[in-house]
Curated annotation (Swiss-Prot):
CTPSs have evolved a hybrid strategy for distinguishing between UTP and CTP. The overlapping regions of the product feedback inhibitory and substrate sites recognize a common feature in both compounds, the triphosphate moiety. To differentiate isosteric substrate and product pyrimidine rings, an additional pocket far from the expected kinase/ligase catalytic site, specifically recognizes the cytosine and ribose portions of the product inhibitor. ATP binds at residues 14-19, 71. This is CTP synthase. The lineage of its organism: Bacteria, Bacillati, Bacillota, Bacilli, Lactobacillales. CDD domains: CTPS_N, GATase1_CTP_Synthase. The gene is pyrG. Its EC number is 6.3.4.2. Residues 294-537 form the Glutamine amidotransferase type-1 domain. The keyword rRNA-binding does not apply. Coiled coil: none annotated. Keywords: ATP-binding, Glutamine amidotransferase, Ligase, Magnesium, Metal-binding, Nucleotide-binding, Pyrimidine biosynthesis. Pathway: Pyrimidine metabolism; CTP biosynthesis via de novo pathway; CTP from UDP: step 2/2.
Length: 539
């Protein structure tokens, strides 16, 4: 029987529910259990695909082409599992499916209401994740905080789950904040008490508390919280601010969190305890890196940390392999000119230009890429970065001064980058991109193929609607550009490289989505190797 763990939050947002859920998932997985992660978002958008990165941060893409919350990236990187369309559900998606059923007459004329129709659809999504993955444990994170109007249907649905699948198969974990008043040097438990009271008022008694705090919580405060919340003191877990993300699962294990979860849910795991030795080595390496490598990231959304979270994480993952800390210098593409690019790139060991949409900042990206190419600075382009590298090459090497992408200039004469043929007639923006996992055949003798361990074909995740225009392929090849990765039918250009450069590779896909702390993605690994000039150092 699948076990269901629901992670909720109270007091304030951004408490680290996703990290808590991921850390627990890692511990349970390392006990030999099959774990599936799930995130419920209470916003009315169908998915985050059309949301501004400044509003939502990065849009994560799953293998099956779902545009999802960035927390799914945390799940995949920390737990090392693959997520799917069942892993991210929004209020908008729930209402859309319910209304479609109503229009088809599936409800036989019934009055469609939040209870039972919306809550039933939410429960269906939870159980569908269990059925499609055959998992031992489903960990579902509920976005927002307890008491939010938007979260009410999700809270009601998970309350009903206890009756649907049996109390012995459901566990509620509630994350709250225990603030420290610096002036009084005193921790306050009242916010936690009120948050749990709010949760209990809708019929959910938490079975475990995870307390976010700046410093360790003494036994007296834990006893007080236990008394007021009716949660046994041994199931009150501290989540202290940590210097490294990798510390969190280890801190939870030290407090016996995974064992307490297994005991509560009567789980007999294949392994008596989580084997975290490899994780400890990773944590030790991350804290004691011996070198520094500076990478300049030129992007459109650099003001928001979360906008490129998978990219910056992938850079760090590669850095661990070379025992070097990656110092990422984020530069707003709009601010770059021919006059200041040399100053911006001063002391930089490499340039990365990640994905994005729209026309803003494109000329700055092109200027940065040109500087990297002419000065043989290792360069990695991703999605839009690959497209701008192609435009730069056409302008400066092929002397096609008006070369551009039709995203920026719809009627340009030399449309090096053009909209994909099957996307021309799409009227909607949302859900109309080339999304998900696609194969790329790698050319022998290229640095790209070497980066991927001499594989013939790789599978990578995409999110774009524009592509390289094939009518320019011959001219590019004659000028020295190598198309080192193409679709198996040779129709779509997936990877370009300049073989005479130290490292100049750009991919149409998003390699950052497949990077893991203990398994850096191939292009990132080779890019940091070239930028740092260091040998690999296994750990």
């Amino acid at each position: 029987m699948t076990k269901y763990i629901f992670v909720t939050g109270g007091v304030v947002s951004s408490l680290g529910k996703g990290i808590t859920a991921s850390s627990l998932g890692r511990l349970l997985k390392n006990r030999g259990l099959k774990v599936t992660m799930q995130k419920f978002d209470p916003y009315i958008n169908i998915d985050p695909g059309t949301m501004s990165p400044y509003q939502h941060g990065e849009v994560y893409v799953t293998e099956d082409g779902t545009e999802a919350d960035l927390d799914l990236g945390h799940y995949e990187r920390i737990v090392d599992v693959r997520t799917s369309k069942y892993s991210n559900v929004t209020t908008g998606k729930i209402y859309q499916e319910v209304l479609e059923k109503e229009r088809r007459g599936d409800y036989n004329g019934a009055t469609v209401q939040v209870i039972p129709h919306i809550t039933d659809m939410i429960k269906k999504k939870i159980m569908r994740a269990a059925l499609t993955t055959d998992s031992d444990v489903i960990i579902s994170e509920i976005g927002g905080t307890v008491g939010d109007m938007e979260s009410t249907p999700f809270m009601e649905a998970i309350r009903q789950m206890r009756r649907e699948v049996g109390e012995e198969n459901v566990m509620y974990i509630h994350c709250t904040l225990v603030p420290l008043l610096h002036a009084a040097h005193e921790m306050k438990t009242k916010p936690t008490q009120h948050s749990v009271a709010e949760l209990r008022s809708i019929g959910i008694q938490p079975n475990m508390l995870v307390l976010r705090a700046e410093q360790p919580i003494d036994q007296e405060h834990k006893n007080k919280i236990s008394t007021f919340t009716d949660v046994p003191v041994d199931r009150i877990i501290e989540s202290i601010d940590a210097p490294s993300l990798f510390d969190v699962p280890l801190a939870f294990q030290k407090q016996g969190m995974d064992q307490k979860v297994c005991d509560f849910l009567h789980i007999d795991s294949p392994k008596p305890e989580a084997d975290m030795e490899a994780w400890k080595k990773l944590d030790d390496r991350a804290k004691n890196l011996k070198h520094h490598t500076k990478i300049t990231l030129v992007g459109k959304y650099v003001e928001l940390e979360d906008a490129y979270i998978s990219v910056t994480d992938a850079l760090q993952h590669a850095g661990y392999l070379y025992n070097t800390k990656i110092d990422v210098d984020k530069v707003q593409a709009e601010d770059i000119t021919e006059d200041n690019i040399a100053k911006i790139m001063e002391g930089s060991d490499g340039l990365i230009v990640p994905g994005g949409f729209g026309t803003r900042g494109l000329e700055g990206m092109i200027t940065a890429i040109k500087y990297a190419r002419e000065n043989d600075i290792p360069f990695l382009g991703i999605c839009l970065g690959m497209q701008m590298a192609s435009v730069e090459f056409a302008r400066d090497i092929l002397n096609l001064e008006d070369a551009n992408t039709t995203e920026a200039e719809p009627h340009c004469k030399n449309n090096i980058i053009d909209i994909m043929a099957d996307k021309r007639d799409e009227e909607n923006i949302g859900g109309t991109l080339r999304l998900g996992l696609y194969p790329a055949a790698l050319k022998k003798g290229t640095k790209t193929r070497e980066a991927y361990g001499d594989q013939d074909v790789i599978q990578e995740r995409h999110r774009h609607r524009f592509e390289f225009n094939n009518k320019y392929r011959e001219a590019f090849e004659k000028a020295g550009m190598v198309f080192s990765g193409v679709s198996p039918d040779n129709h779509l250009v997936e990877i370009i490289e300049l073989p005479k450069k130290k490292f100049f590779i750009a991919a149409q896909y998003h390699p950052e989505f497949l990077s893991r702390p203990q398994r850096p993605e191939g292009l990132f690994k080779s890019f940091i190797g070239a930028a740092s000039g260091l040998p690999e150092q296994e750990f």
